[in-house]
């Protein structure tokens, strides 16, 4: 009998207490996580490097630390804007992705993950992200990165989100059809596609995303949210006067993540599932929430 859980829980390294990358990897393992998400900017800050420091020696060092902690990298994050209209900026961003794709292979072949950009050089959250032209720009930039991923045998995973260019399940499907690369996959964060006007339709949006894009989902993000009555900060707003504030999975009870775990049990058991927006005081509870969901959904699926 296959006893793989429905999901394999992980944590974002920068949601753990302050420390070096090595210290945070050990923290993740001590908490019971077996997967981490490692943003390149966190690695750069800890090591005092830029992309030129992504060497075989560093990869060997990190692999030793990861192995000792019983942890592996689910996603190496690279969040440079692929929809920028600034050509010089775009070329530099391409170089960043190439460096991260190469380093991911040195680490053992983990995917490189990214968000879906905005069509302005400031990467500002604005209505221009909703246009067809924005989607064109992102798809063009993504196609270039996918070519590089294919060349090195790597993977690039995009994470759709309301604050970015790929902000609905249908726009995600369109990108997947236009950039038909075997190296392209999706990180699915259900809460990232929500905003105040649609929170009551959250499960319907989730079902549509799984239907349209489920075959390309390679990793999950797990978080919860609350709605607050102001739009004082950019992001998670939609002109209603409210915005979403994100928390770790299970912290507020506003988003029911269990249907996603049930989908995973049937479609891709053991898929990495990274907790987002936890804080040091809540990380252990978020892990317990995911473990309980994974056990319930995995057992239910095995009984079918």
What spans do the regions from the language model cover?
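Acidic/histidine-rich catalytic cores of soluble enzymes
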Residues: 3-11, 35, 139-251, 296-304
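Active-site beta-loop-alpha junctions enriched in small/polar residues
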Residues: 9-16, 39-43, 78-81, 117-119, ...
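Short, acidic/polar
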Residues: 17-28, 92-101, 199-210
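Catalytic domains of carbohydrate-active enzymes, especially glycoside hydrolases
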Residues: 21-42, 107-108
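Active-site acidic/histidine proton-transfer and metal-coordination neighborhood
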Residues: 23-26, 60-61, 65-69, 83-188
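Short acidic/polar active-site loop segments enriched in Thr and Asp
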Residues: 34, 72, 110, 218, ...
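Glycine-rich, proline-tolerant flexible connector loops at the mouths of alpha/beta enzymes
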Residues: 37-63, 116-122
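C-terminal helical cap(s) of enzyme catalytic domains, especially alpha/beta-barrels
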Residues: 283-303
């Amino acid at each position: 009998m296959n006893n793989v859980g429905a999901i394999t829980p992980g944590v974002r390294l920068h949601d753990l207490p302050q420390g070096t990358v090595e210290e945070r990897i050990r923290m993740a393992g001590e908490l019971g996580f077996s997967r981490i998400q490692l943003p390149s900017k966190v690695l750069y800050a800890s090591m005092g490097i830029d992309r030129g420091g992504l060497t075989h020696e560093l990869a060997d060092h990190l692999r030793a630390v990861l192995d000792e902690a019983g942890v592996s990298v689910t996603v190496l994050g690279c969040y440079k804007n692929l929809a920028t209209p600034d050509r010089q900026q775009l070329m530099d961003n391409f170089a960043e992705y190439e460096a991260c794709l190469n380093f991911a292979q040195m680490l053992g072949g983990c995917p490189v993950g990214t968000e879906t950009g905005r069509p302005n050089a400031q990467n500002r959250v604005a209505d221009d992200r909703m246009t067809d032209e924005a989607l064109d720009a992102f798809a063009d930039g993504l196609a270039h990165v996918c070519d590089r991923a294919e060349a090195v045998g790597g993977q690039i995973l995009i994470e759709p989100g309301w604050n970015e260019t790929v902000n609905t399940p249908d726009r995600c499907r369109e990108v997947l059809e236009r950039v038909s690369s075997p190296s392209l996959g999706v990180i699915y964060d259900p809460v990232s596609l929500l905003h105040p006007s649609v929170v009551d339709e959250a499960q319907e949006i989730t079902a549509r995303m799984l239907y349209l894009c489920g075959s390309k989902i390679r990793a999950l993000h797990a978080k919860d949210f609350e709605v607050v009555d102001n739009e004082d900060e950019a992001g998670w707003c939609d002109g209603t006067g409210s915005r979403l504030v994100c928390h770790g999975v299970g912290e507020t009870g506003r988003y029911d993540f269990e249907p996603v775990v049930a989908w995973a049990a049937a479609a891709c058991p053991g898929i990495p599932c990274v907790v987002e927006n936890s804080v040091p005081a809540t990380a252990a509870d978020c892990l317990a929430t995911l473990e309980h969901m994974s056990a319930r959904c995995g057992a239910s699926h095995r009984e079918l």
